[in-house]
Amino acid sequence: MTTRKSAEVITYPIFTVRWVSIHALAVPTIFFLGSITAMQFIQR
């Protein structure tokens, strides 16, 4: 018990405040950029 692994001490949860704030901004941004670039090639 004297030697602890660093993986057991530092745990990286998936859903953090940083993860939510990044994906709440990045996912709609990439979706709108992809949809806008797709609209450029639509011929009427």
From Swiss-Prot:
GO molecular function terms noted in the UniProt entry = electron transfer activity; heme binding; iron ion binding
Identify the residues that bind heme: H23
Co-factor binding details: With its partner (PsbE) binds heme. PSII binds additional chlorophylls, carotenoids and specific lipids.
GO cellular component term, pick one: chloroplast thylakoid membrane
Print the keywords alphabetically: Chloroplast, Electron transport, Heme, Iron, Membrane, Metal-binding, Photosynthesis, Photosystem II, Plastid, Thylakoid, Transmembrane, Transmembrane helix, Transport
Assembly and oligomerization: Heterodimer of an alpha subunit and a beta subunit. PSII is composed of 1 copy each of membrane proteins PsbA, PsbB, PsbC, PsbD, PsbE, PsbF, PsbH, PsbI, PsbJ, PsbK, PsbL, PsbM, PsbT, PsbX, PsbY, PsbZ, Psb30/Ycf12, at least 3 peripheral proteins of the oxygen-evolving complex and a large number of cofactors. It forms dimeric complexes.
What family classification does the UniProt entry report for this protein?
Answer: Belongs to the PsbE/PsbF family.
- According to UniProt, the name of this protein is Cytochrome b559 subunit beta
Q: What organism is listed for this UniProt entry?
A: Chlamydomonas moewusii
Q: What is the name of the gene encoding this protein?
A: psbF
